[in-house]
Every structure is written in C-alpha cells, then in structure tokens.
Amino acid sequence: MNVLNNKPMLCLWVCAASLSGCFDGNDNNTAMTPMPEPEPEPLMVSYEVTVDNLTQGQPLSPITLILHSEGTLWEIGQPASVALEKVAESGDNEDLLVLDMAMASASGEGLTMPGNAQTITINIEDVTNAYLSVAAMLGKSNDAFTGLNAQGLAGLMVGESWTLFTNAYDAGTEANTEDMASIGAVGGEGFSEVRDDARNMVTMHPGIVSVDDGLATSALTQEQRFDNPVARIRITRTQ
C-alpha cells in the first residue's frame, strides 16, 4: 500500500528532474551577437598636375597645389590674403599650404624655369568633387602670380586629363616699381608687410615695362616681359 501511495510523489520527482535539466545553463536557443561589418577601405583619389612655364624669362616659384571644398585663393577686385601676398612677393608658399580650407596640399620643388615643366602629385581620400587651386609667383616681378582658382574636378574621371592655360595676375600689394630694391629675385626685398600699391586689390597684371622699354630705374630687361597665357596646366586623375 505504501508503494502505491508513493507513485504520485515519484512522478513529481521525475518531472522536476526533467525540468531542471532544461535549465542547466546550456541554452542552445540564445541569440548570437552579429559580427560587425568591416569598415570599407578608403577611396584614394590621386591627381598629377603638370605646370609648363610658357614665359621667355620669368621663373615660377615653387608651385602650390590645394584641394578644397569651398572658398577661393583670390577674387578679382578684392584684397589679396597675406598668404597669397607672400607667394606673389617672395614665392613663399608655407602659409598657403596650411590654409584652413585646404583638405590636401602639395608643393613643387624649387623653381620652374622658362620653357620647363614640373609634375606634382596630390592625393585625397573619399573625395571626388574637390576644387583644385594652383598658385606660383612670376619670380622677376614685384607681385605677379599665376594659377588656377577653385577649378572643379567632379567631372574628371580616372585616366582622363584636362589642359588649361593661366594668365598673370597682380596681387595689388606692392607697387610695380621694378627696381632692384623691391624684387627678391634680383637681390632686393621679397615679402613686406607694408602694402604700397594704392589699389590694394587683385587685378589682371598690366605687364613689365623694363629698362629696355624706357624705365631707367627698372632692374628688368625685355626678356622678363610676358604675354598671356604664362602657364599651361595639365590635370590628370590617376586613381
């Protein structure tokens, strides 16, 4: 009788043991944490920029390249920035290379002499619609420079090239006296904080007069005169 009376208790014990086995910590239904997707590799965008000096007697200072998404290096009729003034008066491009608007920048090596060319590579990640600006001083002048101002690159595909011609500009920061004391390339002063050009704004350059043309105090000869365009710029997207 006792055995028969204990059957319900035995059943309860078996059921309890079975249920406890279901919660032994090995829950195979636990959701797996998904692995994070790897970050995509950055898209490297590369350009080769070749600058040809088309003048007869004007060396170009170290060429400055800047990639940016907004802004311009200069505006006709407006004062030049100090960074541009330094390039136009002395060829010093250090300030221009680190402008706040620059997403990437590069500099040529040394002078690009008349009839010669220099190729510079500039790289940027994940941006295919940047603007390219280029600047260089016409070395034997008071404050003449040439370059590109915010040239859009969105339509330039890998393997394609564009060729553009650039004119000479006057930074409007130094009077065009052409005398030896004011032109660094002939032994005079380069950059000066004093702006003695009454216009104080960027304009198209009127050209060189020179001693051969009757300006007795000029340190320049007819060889340093120039016509537009003064440079040819070829932009190739290589990557």
Residue ranges of model-derived segments:
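C-terminal motif of bacterial Sec signal peptides marking the signal peptidase cleavage site
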Residues: 18-21
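Bacterial signal peptide processing site
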Residues: 23-27
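Structured domain cores in non-transmembrane regions
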Residues: 40-46, 54-159
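Extracellular low-complexity, O-glycosylation-prone Ser/Thr/Pro/Gly-rich "stalks"
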Residues: 55, 61-63, 77, 87, ...
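Intrinsically disordered, low-complexity proline-rich regions
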Residues: 33-41
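Bacterial N-terminal signal peptides that target proteins for export
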Residues: 2-11
